[in-house]
Swiss-Prot record:
Has 3 domains, the large (RuvB-L) and small ATPase (RuvB-S) domains and the C-terminal head (RuvB-H) domain. The head domain binds DNA, while the ATPase domains jointly bind ATP, ADP or are empty depending on the state of the subunit in the translocation cycle. During a single DNA translocation step the structure of each domain remains the same, but their relative positions change. Homohexamer. Forms an RuvA(8)-RuvB(12)-Holliday junction (HJ) complex. HJ DNA is sandwiched between 2 RuvA tetramers; dsDNA enters through RuvA and exits via RuvB. An RuvB hexamer assembles on each DNA strand where it exits the tetramer. Each RuvB hexamer is contacted by two RuvA subunits (via domain III) on 2 adjacent RuvB subunits; this complex drives branch migration. In the full resolvosome a probable DNA-RuvA(4)-RuvB(12)-RuvC(2) complex forms which resolves the HJ. This is Holliday junction branch migration complex subunit RuvB. Its EC number is 3.6.4.-. It comes from the Bacteria. The gene is ruvB. GO terms for molecular function: ATP binding; ATP hydrolysis activity; four-way junction DNA binding; four-way junction helicase activity. SUPFAM superfamilies: P-loop containing nucleoside triphosphate hydrolases (SSF52540), Winged helix' DNA-binding domain (SSF46785). The keyword Membrane does not apply. Disulfide bonds: none annotated.
Length: 343
């Protein structure tokens, strides 16, 4: 399912993100508490001439976890090795990565929650003691040898902290949560990206794009590129607030950052299920969408923004959802009086 406001990175996103990615913490806009903390940790680490403690970065997709790892490595003045949990299939794959690190290098593992238990077992002593155990030979002749590793920093990124095992989670000395960005910070990001990409974008135009970007830089930059296309064809190339609004109308992204699927979901709960509660299976059937799509792609932002709530009996639209749909809230059944589980 292709959505302009999807947080998953496309190939175009990945190519563009490389060119607009900030290098220094000073250029990493937003996430002020994270920036301030990491600045202190990095300065202290460099003063002691040590490896930075292992870092876990978590939060919704598209908020800059990979970008932050690049910034950390740059500020430390070391190389960054990038991989992901699904790519490291065997213990030998991880051993090859670790033994090729130089002192104080940073190893970034995206989707670290998807590491297999066998690979995790190899990672534990590497993180704690900078050592790994390798099996040499097969059968009765097999034996284990220890290999010393140079001091290094592991940065793990995940959108699903609940799937991390406790032993792995406990081995990270620094844990950072990335939050959704404010419209003001997103507008600054849009203006910065526009400057790098040579896009003529007014301050008001950038603010209009930021307002509809769902608190996510990846979406903001994607919307910027699509609005640029519209501006070049329809408005002489300049993105003003009027051009941005017209482009968003064409893209069917409203002022709340909702697309057709978001509005359909809220409208279905309100119109067909009297505002809820409604079980996820019934909702998925009504929308002809997969349950996983609704749970992982559509609902998180609606819940975070207060348009939808999950209860023991199912999903309920809030008064805020009624207001967004320009409808009058109805008298609804309490979601907490009946223990029936509709999940």
């Amino acid at each position: 399912m292709d959505r302009i406001i999807d947080t998953a990175a496309t190939r175009e996103d990945e190519a563009i993100e490389v060119s607009i990615r900030p290098k220094r913490l000073a250029d990493y806009l937003g996430q002020q508490p994270v920036r301030e903390q990491m600045d202190i940790y990095i300065q202290a680490t460099k003063a002691r001439a040590e490896a930075l403690d292992h870092v876990l970065i978590f939060g919704p997709p598209g908020l800059g976890k990979t970008t932050l790892s690049h910034v950390i490595a740059y500020e430390l003045g070391v190389k960054l090795r990038v991989t992901s949990g699904p790519v490291i299939e065997k213990a030998g794959d991880l051993a090859a990565l670790l033994t090729n690190l130089q002192p104080y290098d940073v190893l970034f593992i995206d989707e670290i929650h998807r590491l297999s238990p066998v690979v995790e077992e190899v990672l534990y002593p590497a993180m704690e003691d900078f050592q790994i155990d390798i099996m040499i030979g097969e059968g009765p002749a097999a034996r284990s040898i220890k290999i010393d590793l140079p001091p290094f920093t592991l940065i793990g990124a995940t959108t699903r902290t609940g799937l991390l095992t406790a032993p792995l989670r406990d081995r990270f000395g620094i844990v950072q949560r990335l939050e959704f960005y404010s419209p003001e910070d997103l507008a600054r990001i849009v203006r910065r990206s526009a400057g790098i990409l040579n896009i003529d974008c007014t301050t008001e135009g950038a603010a209009e794009i930021a307002q509809r970007a769902r608190g996510t830089p990846r979406i903001a930059n994607r919307l910027l590129r699509r609005v640029r296309d519209y501006a070049e064809v329809k408005a002489g190339g300049q993105i003003t607030i009027e051009v941005a609004q017209a482009a968003m109308q064409m893209l069917k992204v409203d002022q709340g950052g909702f697309d057709e699927l978001d509005r359909r979901l809220l409208h279905t709960i309100v119109e067909y299920f009297d505002g809820g509660p409604v079980g996820i299976e019934s909702l998925a059937a009504s929308l002809s969408e997969e349950r996983g799509t609704l749970e992982d792609v559509v609902e998180p932002y609606l819940i975070q923004q207060g348009f939808l709530v999950r209860t023991a009996r199912g999903r309920m639209a809030t008064d805020k959802a009624y207001q967004h749909l320009a409808l009058q809230p109805r008298e609804r059944v309490s979601a907490f009086t009946d223990p029936e589980d509709l999940f």
